[in-house]
Amino acid sequence: MLFDYNFKRYNFRILIYVILLSGIGVMAIWSATNQDRSMIAKQIFGIILGLILAICLSLVDYTRLLSLHVLIYGACVVFLAAVLLMGRTAGGATRWLILPVIGAIQPAEFVKIGLILFFSWYFQRYQEKINQPITLAVGAALFALPAFMILEQPNLSTTLVTTVIIASVVFCSGVSYKWILGVLAVLFPLGAVFVYMLQYEMIPFLRGYQATRILAWINPKEYSAAYWQQENSIM
């Protein structure tokens, strides 16, 4: 059974912390939206739904959940494909699916969790062969498909975040430092070439605003207008 939990061991303290933090978030929205009741109601509904889902998932034995690795990976690909084929477009990006009752959801956010589970299984399954080129190549190919589909939405930020997450999974899986140092040795010069090409809009898979945001992060003074959003998010 997936659900086989001793409630005496349940960490209710974490649940209380989540509720308190969510309450602070609701108050912040109440203040920022000039007490817009519709926004507050939507936020509270999302919190309740999220809490129910989080509690259910916390009761699942993750080791048994990993036995569904093929289904999990398949669901990630199917949902991302559904976004590209029939997703809702807003602001030039197609990132959302409209579901009955629930409303708009962004599958890429759930895909992060799915890929963590899948690649946790993958590198556990092939632990003894983890440093073989074929093992890493297959893992890279399996990651490339959903990553490309997220990038096509377009959603560069989520693609980068997901890449860092899966890279962390690979690092924690016990891959040899020779591979890590080798990859870094290749990435550093490639990064310099990337920045150079970025300045002259020579990166075909990046939209104009995406390139500008990256350049603003590297050189905020020269791209002060584009850096405004990043600067205010830090404040």
Model-derived segments and spans:
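Hydrophobic, glycine- and aromatic-enriched re-entrant/interface helices and adjoining loop segments
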Residues: A90, T94-W96, V183-M235
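Membrane-helix boundary/helix-loop-helix interface segments in multi-pass membrane proteins
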Residues: M1-G23, M27-P154
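Flexible, glycine/proline-enriched loop segments at strand-loop-helix junctions
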Residues: Y126, V169-F171, P220-Y223
